[in-house]
Design a protein with these regions (language model features):
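Aromatic- and charge-enriched surface segment that lines or borders ligand/interaction sites
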Residues: 110-155, 178, 255, 264-267, ...
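Detector for C-terminal structural segments
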Residues: 2, 34-36, 230, 304-307, ...
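Surface-exposed binding/hinge segments that line
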Residues: 57, 124, 158-204
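Alpha-helical secondary-structure segments
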Residues: 63, 138-145, 178-180, 222-223, ...
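N-terminal lobe/hinge region of extracytoplasmic solute-binding protein
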Residues: 65-116, 147, 217-219
Length: 627
């Protein structure tokens, strides 16, 4: 959970994500931003000194400017990429991803193996991982985490799809975890769930409301420990010197929220921040302005996100009750496909992204070639406004004397599109939609909000700009379109992205989840994308590049993922921030940083018995995005 992306539990607010359906943080927490210490630079109180100099005790501080605020510090609730990225730094997962090629490698588990029938999986839990309060991390912590998700709907909010097929989870010993399945599950080496300390979390009452932001430092066993947090302002972490892979090289890591991304870029120029991620990437203008700047490096890499228009298919809950106010014409597949054909993707790539993106088609970006899908020539809904107009006529939505397309109620059709107020791409594409769909006789109202979550969850929209960070194993971002992801009742928060519930899609989803053969599963995932494309519910317009920048006089070296032409922010792992070397050290090169990552990886051994090439598959790790 982009997703999950989610810009992660791949962007999602619903796009400012990896993952699903955050609960609102207490508004009062935002006032904490006004009481920051003098040594901390914030958008509300910028300081002239560099990010590293901001720590008056001489510590090396890496400050990351982000375009998302944290939705929750609880790994059971968080869906935004910034939140799930922080959770990867706070907690270990059973497995991790190799930063070179995305293959499954040891995390909290040193090895894992299935039974002959693939229904029982045994994980060996490492004995050298400790919680930051000094207690040993054990298999009991993992078993408790999974069991809580299996028995508490609140704890299953973000990542419940991973445990839905679990029959029983036990910890026969401190280093042995056993998971019994109801039926085969191909994601058992890709369980993207943060493992939490039982002795801390067993004291939590309502998991649906607890945001893990009451006591600091927050107990974890990842490379960093959260020491402070102010809503809509910052998250501060310190290096975990007892981390089993070795301590990070930076003493502190700060994620600082900037609503205005031009201000974030300006802060990078001044040296007030070390790194800027963008919203979720730098705009072409921002990237161009930084190219050639002294001590600044722009990283432009193929992205793991898709950028889409999500259609409200008629919001409903599992209990069958309908809610929201989506336009009734969008229930017609022919109308949805007509809207597809009235979107010029080439113009969006050339004019909006200015080449920093690839034209969208399937749900999984081309970066993940195993699962990437393209429609056939006869299937592709190419830009053809005349054909789109014809489809609308055939569907019974014709123009009146004023040239306005009218609905079955005789009123002119006007679609409300949810738009992220902080995302310039949303606004730019929205203007094109007003032009293109206006030629069809359809009105468009852009509803650009700081918080799109509330109307989205309420089903009070017609279409919405959407996007998730997809992971090497795309199961999570596929699961959010199943009927099982719908909320139990209209008052509940489900894992669904945009209320899709399609029987054929569900059948294909179940088949891919149970398929251990890598090639057969990849084919089923492509069939899923084909089905999603044909329904017209998700119009993937682009795959944006990961465009980001950092100061080379503050960061000597940092690991990208994948190693060749990869991103830094929002990785499927903690490699970037864990490996980052302060420029003041001056001895580490990019190669030595990467070597450190390799050394940390080969310390573990993966048992592949009985599964063949399955573990060689690229798997999911975050939205994101989880997002």
């Amino acid at each position: 959970m982009d997703t999950h992306a989610p810009y992660d539990k791949p962007k999602r607010t619903p796009r400012l994500p990896r993952r699903l359906r955050p609960l609102r943080l207490l508004a009062a927490a935002a006032t904490a931003a006004l009481t920051l210490t003098a040594g901390l630079t914030t958008p509300l109180n910028p300081a002239p000194q560099s990010a590293q100099a901001a720590a008056d005790d001489g510590k090396d501080v890496l400050t990351v400017a982000v375009a998302q605020s944290v939705d929750s510090l609880s790994p059971f609730l968080a869906t935004r990429l910034v939140s799930t990225s922080i959770h990867r730094l706070m907690y270990e997962y059973l497995t991790n991803y190799d930063p070179k090629d995305n293959r499954a490698i040891p995390g909290l588990a040193t090895k894992w193996e299935p039974s002959a029938d693939k229904l029982t999986w045994t994980y060996t839990i490492r004995d050298n991982s400790k919680w930051s309060d000094g207690k040993q991390a054990t298999a009991e912590d993992a078993a408790w985490t999974f069991n809580k998700m299996m028995t508490d709907d609140g704890a299953a909010t973000a990542n419940g799809s991973f445990v839905a097929n679990f029959r029983e989870v036990t910890a026969p010993s401190p280093t042995k975890l056993v998971i019994e399945l109801k039926k085969p599950q191909a994601t058992m080496a890709a369980l993207d769930v943060p493992i939490v300390p039982k002795h801390v979390w067993e004291n939590v009452g309502d998991f649906s409301k607890f945001n893990n932001d009451r006591t600091y430092p927050i107990v974890g066993n990842g490379p960093f420990v959260v020491t402070d947090y102010a809503a809509d302002s910052f998250v501060r972490l310190k290096a975990n010197t007892s981390f089993w892979r070795g301590a990070p090289k930076f003493d502190e890591l700060v994620f600082r929220y900037y609503k205005d991304q031009d201000a974030a870029v300006a802060a990078l120029r001044k040296g007030e921040v070390s790194f800027v991620a963008g919203a979720p990437a730098l705009t072409p203008a921002q990237a161009a302005s930084l190219e050639g700047e002294e001590n600044i490096k722009v990283n432009d890499a193929p992205g793991r996100r898709f950028y889409a228009l999500a259609t409200n298919p008629g919001a409903r809950a599992k209990d069958g009750e309908k809610f929201g106010d989506g336009h009734e014409s969008l229930l017609d597949q022919q109308v949805r496909q007509a809207l597809f054909m009235a979107v010029d993707r080439k113009t969006i790539i050339d004019k909006v992204f200015q080449g920093y993106a690839v034209e969208g088609e399937g749900y999984v970006p081309p970066r993940f070639s195993t699962y990437h899908w393209k429609p056939t020539d006869g299937q592709k809904l190419s830009y053809a406004p005349d054909k789109a107009s014809q489809l609308l006529d055939e569907a019974g939505y014709k123009k009146n004397a004023d040239g306005k397309r009218v609905g079955k109620d005789g009123k002119p059709i006007n679609y409300r599109i949810l738009c992220h107020a902080t995302d310039p791409q949303d606004k730019a594409v929205g203007k094109y939609l007003q032009e293109w769909w206006g030629e069809l006789g359809i009105g468009v109202t852009l509803n650009c909000l700081d918080n799109v979550t509330d109307p989205w969850l309420a089903g009070e929209y017609d279409l919405a700009f959407d996007g998730w960070s997809v992971n090497p194993d795309p199961d999570f971002v596929l699961s959010i379109h199943t009927c099982a992801a719908l909320p139990a009742t209209p008052k509940d928060t489900g894992a669904t992205d945009n209320f899709i519930c399609d029987k054929r899609y569900d059948e294909l989803y179940g088949k891919q989840l149970a398929e251990y053969d890598a090639a057969k599963r990849a084919d089923l995932v492509k069939q899923l994308q084909s089905r999603l494309y044909d329904t017209g519910y998700m119009n993937v317009m682009a795959y944006p590049n990961a465009v980001e920048a950092y100061r080379t006089d503050q960061i000597e070296s940092i690991t990208t993922m994948p190693r060749d032409a990869g991103n830094i922010y929002g990785q499927d792992g903690y490699w970037s921030w864990w490996s980052a070397t302060p420029a003041a050290v001056g001895e580490a090169s990019e190669e030595s940083s990467s070597a450190g990552v390799i050394i940390g990886i080969v310390a573990g051994v993966v048992v592949l018995a009985g599964v063949g090439s399955f573990f060689g598959m690229r798997r999911r790790a975050s939205a994101e995005d989880r997002e």
